[in-house]
Amino acid sequence: MWLQVILGRQRAVLRSSLSFRFLFGSTLISGLGTWLAVIALSVDVFDRTHSGVWVSALLIADFLPAVAIGFLLGPLVDRLSRKRLLVGADVVRLAAFILLALAVKPWQIVALAFVAGVATGFARPVVYAGLPNLVDTETLPRANSLLRTAEQLTVTTGTLLGGIVVAAAGPDVAYWLNAASFLLSATLLVQIPGGMLQEGRVASHGHWRDLAEGFDVVRRSRALLTVLLTWNLVQIGIALVNVSEVVLAKVSFKSGDFGFGLMWAASGVGAAIGALLAASLLARRSMTLVYAAAIGVMAFGDLAAALSPDVWVAVWCIALGNVGTATAIVCNSLLVQRGAPDHVRGRAFTLIMGSNFAVLGIGMGIAGVLVNAVGARWVWGISAGFTALGAIVGYALLRRTPQAVLEPAVT
């Protein structure tokens, strides 16, 4: 019954705004293609090189652009047309994946993945910076929840389909399918009215002054500072888990590839449930409580998985932890959207996302050494510690944030 109510409310969000339907459809279609291609890229590079160094280069090429954009190019998300940025990002990724299907050298694959990463580095903050302009204040939590649910479903479904497609037909077919997904996505995005994604034209005072204004708004806003500090702590925990998960499955639990896949699936299912439930939880409880509790659930899930006797117990812990992860991510989006005015919201998102990716990259580098030194169970326990610290910091900071910022009155 409760699920029917939640789904009914989510359908109401889709019915409330035609422009949001276009954005949702774009997110769903392009996300499915993207995650399908993630598997293809990794397999393609490894099969051509049999080198972990090249695979690492591919992963760096994927997230490094987001770091650079966050620290150096954020003003463009506010200054330029957000609609044109979104459509342009899809066109660039369309071209990149067509060329990937024709690439023959590993360096070409990594270079084109970097180009696609640059486009994605602009597209993600644009979507969430522009979202508050497509729906009303009351609907915004459910709209965020719906977009995050779509993203989580594409992660689970896309990676599964990617494995099937690559195994059956090779990486090139996956690249062509992803290119087609960006073509369909761009077709939907061009139908959003040009001015809908931002309140108006933002005057520039020079790139470096514009950039400094973005840093300043994050520093001065309690809500934005909460997301920056809290989620950077959580990202350390996420990095430790991501790197050591395969070791936990294969070495600690002795469950092989099947166990690793089972843990991955549990993560996806838990995250989809968390994203779906987030808006309903926020309607019943305060942002401060939901945010801190969600991160606390993440920490509990990591610790419980570390202590689990086998993979069959661990998957339930992992699923529960990812319910918390997805709920907290919805809260992150809302805190930034409510804490930053539209003319600097793009800079706020790019800076926070860039910082998060930078910490994630550093954490992944440390995790590789740590898992070899102390083992996967201890690494997951350490992850739980960082995440629990994030919950405490988030709660302490939000307690002092004006209620009008956390939960503005519906007009």
Question: Residues of each region from the PLM?
Answer:
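Alpha-helical transmembrane-bundle signature of multi-pass membrane transport and export proteins
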Residues: M1-T411
